[in-house]
């Protein structure tokens, strides 16, 4: 799998991966332009890391709130105003009746709560090793602590089983097992004021914390697809290695566009080798700062 291979390559190059940890504070030293990152491991132990750069895919709201020295009150209010939509998936293992081969299908039936159904075997047969079974992921869009989110796993599995039969993708007795995965802050909310809030946050972070780099959907509060979210991290690494802003990460969007800063030179000369996904475009207008 891709992420297992990524982890092995990281460790082979001397990197260390800490799982199940919670960052509690990011402290910036303006004199040395360096960071001290404090985190808690899964056993509750406290640790500290010194860093020249911090790359964050954590939700922008929480990242801004954990910075030391603290941001201005204006930026703090902007961060606290950002909203998120949460998400849960009910995975059902059932008899394979070859109902559909797509990776996913959207459900528009108002009589059910499910919004999308994933077919995990269509992503990779290795995800469903039993050839006689299929695993469907029924996706529900919700808010943390609402009725759906707060339902226990057994109730959610029963709801998903019943709705899968109702929409014609299963029959009684097909489902043999199920589990639930909840994902907080899966979607950044684009309300009337989010762009202003993000622009306000970006402006102060760029001015006061130049070696803090925001990437990914939550980190940038930007509704990127997974491949575009990963591209922001890849281009961010190029910026860090070059010690300059070669790429404007905020131009990576749903059309796989980005803007390379500076002279127009070939990828062969730069050696970046990232041309298969994004294409070069003119810089988009900056978001207006909060007035």
Model-derived regions: residue spans:
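C-terminal segments that line or cap access tunnels to active or ligand-binding sites in enzymes
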Residues: 41, 47-53, 57-231, 238-251, ...
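Generic detector of low-complexity/intrinsically disordered segments
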Residues: 18, 90, 166, 233, ...
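Glycine-centered flexibility sites
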Residues: 15, 20, 216-219, 233
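Active-site-proximal substrate-binding core of FAD-dependent oxidoreductases
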Residues: 28, 174-185, 240-291
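Helical element adjacent to the flavin cofactor pocket in flavoenzyme catalytic cores
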Residues: 1-53, 57
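Predominant activation on well-ordered alpha-helical scaffold segments within soluble catalytic domains
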Residues: 4, 234-237
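Proteins with a high burden of low-complexity, intrinsically disordered sequence enriched in S/T/G/P/A and R
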Residues: 12, 199-203, 288-289
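Acidic/histidine-rich catalytic neighborhood
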Residues: 35-37, 47, 57, 62-64, ...
């Amino acid at each position: 799998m891709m992420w297992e291979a990524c982890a092995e390559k990281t460790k082979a190059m001397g990197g260390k991966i800490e799982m199940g940890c919670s960052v509690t504070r990011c402290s910036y030293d303006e004199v040395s332009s360096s960071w001290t990152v404090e985190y808690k491991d899964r056993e509750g132990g406290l640790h500290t890391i010194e860093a020249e750069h911090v790359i964050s895919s954590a939700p922008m709201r929480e990242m801004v709130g954990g910075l030391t020295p603290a941001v201005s009150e204006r930026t703090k209010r902007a961060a606290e105003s950002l909203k998120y939509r949460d998400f849960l998936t009910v995975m059902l293992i059932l008899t394979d009746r070859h109902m559909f081969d797509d990776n996913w299908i959207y459900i528009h039936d108002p009589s059910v709560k499910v919004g999308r159904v994933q077919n995990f075997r269509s992503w990779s047969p290795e995800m469903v090793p039993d050839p006689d079974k299929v695993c469907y992921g029924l996706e529900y869009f919700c808010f943390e602590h609402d009725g759906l989110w707060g339902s226990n796993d057994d109730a959610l599995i029963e709801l998903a089983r019943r709705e899968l039969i109702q929409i014609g993708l299963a029959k009684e007795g097909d489902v043999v097992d199920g589990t639930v995965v909840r994902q907080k802050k899966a979607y950044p909310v684009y309300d009337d004021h989010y762009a202003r809030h993000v622009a306000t946050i970006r402006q102060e972070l760029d001015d006061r914390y130049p070696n803090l780099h925001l990437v990914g959907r939550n980190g940038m509060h930007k509704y990127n697809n997974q491949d575009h979210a990963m591209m922001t991290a890849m281009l961010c690494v190029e910026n860090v290695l070059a010690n300059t802003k070669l790429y404007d990460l905020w131009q990576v969007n749903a059309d796989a566009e980005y803007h390379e800063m500076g002279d127009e030179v070939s990828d062969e000369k730069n050696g970046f080798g990232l041309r298969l996904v994004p294409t070069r475009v003119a810089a988009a207008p900056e978001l207006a700062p909060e007035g």
